[in-house]
Amino acid sequence: MPIGVPKVPFRNPGEDDISWIDVYNRLYRERLLFLGQEVESEISNQLIGLMIYLSIEDENKDLYFFINSPGGWVLPGIAIYDTMQFVPPEVHTICLGLAASMGSFILVGGTITKRLAFPHARVMIHQPAAAFYEAQAGEFVMEAEELLKLREIITKVYVQRTGKPLWVVSEDLERDVFMSATEAQTHGIVDLVAVQ
């Protein structure tokens, strides 16, 4: 039987009564964001909304973005990345568990010097994929062109944010490349590995 989202006690400033709110709401109030699922439009919009709201509330207080994601859709992931670059607060990205595909793209998008992986975390990068098998010939060509544009965007971001040469990033994106936290640090995807 699923337990649902745990509830925690919370007292609003200046109030005597305690109310019970879900744990994520409580953590959002502390500027802690979580991506613990596949990247798709709904979670992307929620995280974008939270980042914008929290930056309006206090543009000088950092955001902490925890990632444990198998990846997901490219455009919703790029939207999260773009928002991270747009909002005034610095965004710390923290990988726990797995940051694969779009999860690693979001991880690398954190403020440089403030990207961290837990010691047993795994990171995976690869090129974007599409479902060509159902497309008509004309759609196939258009989708291939769009995919090339997206690959170019993703490659440029990894080059810019990791400091690796274009040829290294391009070669790595050709296949699934899994990394330990230390390897991700060497690769420039994270800046620090948390100590045990």
From Swiss-Prot:
Instruction: Give the signal peptide range.
Output: none
Which Pfam families is this protein grouped with? CLP_protease
Question: For this protein, what is the EC number?
Answer: 3.4.21.92
The main location is: plastid
Q: Which InterPro entries match?
A: ClpP, ClpP/crotonase-like_dom_sf, ClpP/TepA, ClpP_His_AS, ClpP_Ser_AS
Q: What class of enzyme is it?
A: hydrolase
Q: Which residues form the active site?
A: 101, 126
Q: Which reaction does it catalyse?
A: Hydrolysis of proteins to small peptides in the presence of ATP and magnesium. alpha-casein is the usual test substrate. In the absence of ATP, only oligopeptides shorter than five residues are hydrolyzed (such as succinyl-Leu-Tyr-|-NHMec, and Leu-Tyr-Leu-|-Tyr-Trp, in which cleavage of the -Tyr-|-Leu- and -Tyr-|-Trp bonds also occurs)
Cell compartments where the protein resides: Plastid, Chloroplast stroma
Q: Name one GO molecular function term.
A: ATP-dependent peptidase activity
Q: Which GO terms describe its biological process?
A: protein quality control for misfolded or incompletely synthesized proteins
For this record, the Gene Ontology CC terms, alphabetical, are: chloroplast stroma; endopeptidase Clp complex
User: Keywords on this record?
Assistant: Chloroplast, Hydrolase, Plastid, Protease, Serine protease
Transferase found in the keyword field: no
The function of this protein is: Cleaves peptides in various proteins in a process that requires ATP hydrolysis. Has a chymotrypsin-like activity. Plays a major role in the degradation of misfolded proteins.
Record family assignment: Belongs to the peptidase S14 family.
- Oligomer status and interactors: Component of the chloroplastic Clp protease core complex.
Protein known as: ATP-dependent Clp protease proteolytic subunit
Give the source species.
Vitis vinifera
